[in-house]
Amino acid sequence: MVYKIKKYGEDVLKQIAKEVELSEINDEFRQFLDDMVETMYETDGVGLAAPQIGVSKRIFVCDDGNGVLRKVINPIIVPLTEETQEFEEGCLSVPGIYKKVERPKRVLLKYLNEYGKEVEEIAENFLAVVVQHENDHLDGILFIEKISPMAKRLIAKKLANIKKETKRIKEENE
């Protein structure tokens, strides 16, 4: 099942997502994760957080660019270096906008997998960018909040148009 992506202006994208309880992790939950993966690939994304499909839970899925898929539940991210990297980011929830964001180059990612088992791994370079971007969604933060003031001014009109379209669609569906 492919979910509809929530766009900039939707309230769910500004909320702090709730933790997943261990008791919630079952076959139905794993099917939900598979549907998230399908949605991510169908929309040409490299990551997708649950709030982006209207589910305020601490879950994201991502592909490291080499075909290695992760299904991440209740993530904790710890920077492992002060060295940063700047990477041009985009977001399925903020279509058509790509801007450079500076983030730690290497992080420790702790999470539960789709079976409720604890996983710890080091994410570097591109994967570090992806997991930090997706984790921000779980805290109600979009990448456009992390760009320079000048870059924000340059995209203000595009953002206003996305928000206006989101509001129009929401009103049509009510």
UniProtKB/Swiss-Prot annotation:
Protein name per the record: Peptide deformylase
Function: Removes the formyl group from the N-terminal Met of newly synthesized proteins. Requires at least a dipeptide for an efficient rate of reaction. N-terminal L-methionine is a prerequisite for activity but the enzyme has broad specificity at other positions.
Biological process, per Gene Ontology: co-translational protein modification; translation
Catalytic activity from the UniProt record: N-terminal N-formyl-L-methionyl-[peptide] + H2O = N-terminal L-methionyl-[peptide] + formate
Cofactor details (free text): Binds 1 Fe(2+) ion.
Gene that this sequence comes from: def
Transmembrane domains' residue ranges: none
Listed PANTHER family: PEPTIDE DEFORMYLASE
Family statement drawn from the similarity comment of this UniProt entry: Belongs to the polypeptide deformylase family.
Annotated InterPro entries: Peptide_deformylase, Peptide_deformylase_sf
Natural source organism: Fusobacterium nucleatum subsp. nucleatum (strain ATCC 25586 / DSM 15643 / BCRC 10681 / CIP 101130 / JCM 8532 / KCTC 2640 / LMG 13131 / VPI 4355)
Molecular function as annotated in GO: metal ion binding; peptide deformylase activity
Keyword Cytoplasm included in the entry's annotation: no
EC top class named in words: hydrolase
Essential cofactor(s): Fe(2+)
EC number of this enzyme: 3.5.1.88
